[in-house]
Amino acid sequence: MDTKLLDILACPICKGPLKLSADKTELISKGAGLAYPIRDGIPVMLESEARTLTTEERLDK
């Protein structure tokens, strides 16, 4: 995924910023507490496809 997209993409739920996961497989929304998958380089920004962040992930800065 092109990291330049992070400058223009926002979480569709809370409208907050997104952060690329360390392994570059998800876009993380701390505001919504969700992780959106990246499949074949394309972020899938559907709430139904997102996973809920664990408590540890939510607290991780």
Swiss-Prot record:
InterPro entries: Trm112-like. Coiled coil: none annotated. Pfam families: Trm112p. One of its GO terms (cellular component) is cytosol. SUPFAM superfamilies: Trm112p-like. HAMAP family: UPF0434 (MF_01187). PANTHER family: PROTEIN PREY, MITOCHONDRIAL (PTHR33505:SF4), ZGC:162634 (PTHR33505). Belongs to the UPF0434 family. This is UPF0434 protein PFL_1779. The lineage of its organism: Bacteria, Pseudomonadati, Pseudomonadota, Gammaproteobacteria, Pseudomonadales.
